[in-house]
From Swiss-Prot:
Sites of Phosphoserine modification: 29, 73, 115
Basic and acidic residues compositional bias, start-end: 34-48
TM region positions: none
Organism listed in the record: Saccharomyces cerevisiae (strain JAY291) (Baker's yeast)
Protein name: Spindle pole component BBP1
Signal peptide: none
Major location (coarse): cytoplasm
Coiled-coil regions listed: 229-355
Superkingdom in the source lineage: Eukaryota
Amino acid sequence: MNQEDNTGGGGIFGLFKWTKDALFGTDISPSMKYKDQEERRDRSRYAQDDTNFSMKFGNDSNRRSTNLSRSNSWSGLDSTLHRKYELLPEYNENGFNSIVNGDHHSKERIRSLRSPAPIVPREPLRNEPTDTFGHRLHTKRRTINELSNSQIPFIPPQEDDPLLSKLFNKDGVNEVRRSPYKLSVKDIPGKFPSPLTKRDEIDNYYVRDEDACHNNREYKKAYFDLFAQMDLNSRDLEDLCEDVREQREQFHRNEQTYKQAYEEMRAELVNELKKSKTLFENYYSLGQKYKSLKKVLDQTISHEAELATSRERLYQEEDLKNFEIQTLKQRLSDLELKYTNLQIEKDMQRDNYESEIHDLLLQLSLRNNERKDTSAGSNIFSTGQYDRTPFHNGNNSYDSNSHSWDTDYLKNIDGFIER
């Protein structure tokens, strides 16, 4: 078993040693050892073996503790260790290996896990039911208010702890608590003596009574029962890890499906937006054309109204002009008729005047002839003189077309008529 411990091999001996050291050899449980540790610790505070030299035993409290560093199970953690022990690599939120992809948060976490864990932390995280006796004895218990900001909710230890009750009888524990002697670390079963312990103390350590040996055998049986239970828990943990891995793969597949659907939906949305933009532009241009056509239509309607008004006015003016034309034509007809009547009347008057003149001239000439005949004899009128009168031209008839009037003679006739 020592060879297995020195070589760092696995198996039941390594598991037994690791569990034993976790329960009794250190001041912190394995569940608390790798939770939320500081990134950088003072490596000189930890020993390189499984002995805690900073513990104080009895009256040796003034003894100077040796500052040594100690390695842990995270030392040398790399991909080879993952393949050797079939460990799952660290994945970031995107589903890739955070160590390979250079995730800063995961690198910090791995660095903190690989750094040595403190044997006696300055501020323990929380009191768990699986804490060892040494941690409960030498560690100040934190209050609930101090643990209120923790990521994991605080669970106070139960009065009847199932793990501790399986190792120890409750009556025995109560009896030890009621004893007047103070419980020391050396009284804890399974505790190995410190290398700095005196030789006589080592000899006394191996000298035990029969009851102590019997109790140790019972404890050993309980240890193996716990190891079997831990083996079952490890198998359940492996199954759980497998389920987690399958769920993670399913999650990544679903995420890829959702991502592809999102990309398709996004592309479709972009196309719809482009179509909507084109439709809006066409609608806007159509609206502008509609406004211009409506404006032209309004102008056309206004022009048509003006044209109808002008046409009506022209029709009225045309009717008025036609009425005036008819009136003028009627007046012209009346004037023409009146002119014709006047012309006829004038012709008749002229004929009457000519006939009267002819009669008067004839009377005058007869009167003159009678006067001459009485005064001068029968030769008063010569033939030549008689022929010069316009009314005595051959057949003693009046020529209406003859214009050779003796104006002086007619003047005398007019003067005679006036007298």
